[in-house]
Amino acid sequence: MDAFKVIGGKPLRGDVVISGAKNAALPILMSALLSKTPVVFSNVPQLNDILTTVKLLGQLGAKTKWLNEEKLMIDASSIDVCRAPYDLVKTMRASILVLGPLLARMGHAEVSLPGGCAIGARPVNLHIQGLKLMGADITVEDGYIVAKKQGRLTGATIFMDTVSVTGTENLMMAAALAEGITIIENAAREPEIVDLANCLISMGAKITGAGTDTLTIEGVSELCGKEYSVMPDRIETGTFLVAAAVTQGHIKCLNTDPSSLEAVLSKLQEAGATITTGDDWIELEMSAPAKAVNVRTAPHPAFPTDMQAQFMTMNVLAEGTATVIETIFENRFMHVPELQRMGADIALEGNTAIVKGVASLNGAQVMATDLRASASLVIAGLVAKSPTQVDRIYHIDRGYLCIEGKLQSLGADITRIKVD
């Protein structure tokens, strides 16, 4: 098993190229199931979840081919399998995103109940309820969601009881091939939703309202994709910016989108960072310890839950006391005991963490528990007074493309090692 050995004390300096967004690429690759023609996707990061998705699409009968390290061709014109098996779905919760496209295209879908990070229930009932409103007959049998529909799905008005990114994505893809108009109310507004909508529109879908809480989809009889480029990863961008801030460094993130990170950039400025932006770059300079900043996660455009752990680490070393409130997922403070092992002063009260800044952290052997928690531990290691070993980094490999190589290019002392 791999681990990271991190030796702290070096400010991050230089330029870093941001990869394509995993959370945008996953639904976009699934959307190829809707297309009767081959689609070429660019800016696709070759992460474990992406490779699992490619394997899953192949098992459904799609032809896939990497044209270069970030360009992928998917031809789903002759898909002939409607079952997404447990052995693939168990490793990646986003596998549920084949449900809507398969049902809309084939009239039949069987998807194993999903796995992924252990950070809360993340129920799939919103997906099922929405598809039922569109006329699908859905049962759960032996751990599989079995969905059927004779003929095309039917447009419907769907109110999402809670804001769900994957729920919105699944229903939007299904509605693209439905008969009639579908309105999704209380829809997720994340930039990744907008990216998926733009991809579907490029295939011939009729979608309005992406980025607002009301989506309107006028179904069409077929979709034909050509080429589409995945948006930059806003969470990877934010992670590097926080790492630079914590190490009091000076970096420039290239191939990114400042407009997708407004809440994060605002909080970094509040912490004392100097930030400059262009159309596709963000520059951050930090010349003093961060000031403590309160954080409350909420659906976009508010502060993203996927940046909570990284900001927790920044607050651990900040001047003052901060509260970090997590409203999206339960069980998303699993990095706190690991940070405490390094000397952090954090008290938990339900979904709130009270963080009192300390002067320094000590290195320790710590364990990654989920994707973003692992990033927060790496950041802590970058400033610890003694070496840090981060175990179970397969979590971080699910969401960050060669993070150690990018950090090394910025001056960090981090190496991947083999452990028992």
Curated annotation (Swiss-Prot):
Is Ribosomal protein one of the keywords UniProt gives this record? no
Q: Does the keyword Transferase apply?
A: yes
Q: Which UniProt keywords apply?
A: Cell cycle, Cell division, Cell shape, Cell wall biogenesis/degradation, Cytoplasm, Peptidoglycan synthesis, Pyruvate, Transferase
Q: In which pathway does it act?
A: Cell wall biogenesis; peptidoglycan biosynthesis
Recorded superkingdom: Bacteria
What residues does UDP-N-acetyl-alpha-D-glucosamine bind to? 93, 306, 328
The record's annotation in PANTHER family points to: UDP-N-ACETYLGLUCOSAMINE 1-CARBOXYVINYLTRANSFERASE (PTHR43783:SF1)
Protein family per UniProt: Belongs to the EPSP synthase family. MurA subfamily.
Q: What task does this protein carry out?
A: Cell wall formation. Adds enolpyruvyl to UDP-N-acetylglucosamine.
Q: What is this protein called?
A: UDP-N-acetylglucosamine 1-carboxyvinyltransferase
Species of provenance: Colwellia psychrerythraea (strain 34H / ATCC BAA-681) (Vibrio psychroerythus)
Task: Report which gene this protein is encoded by.
Answer: murA
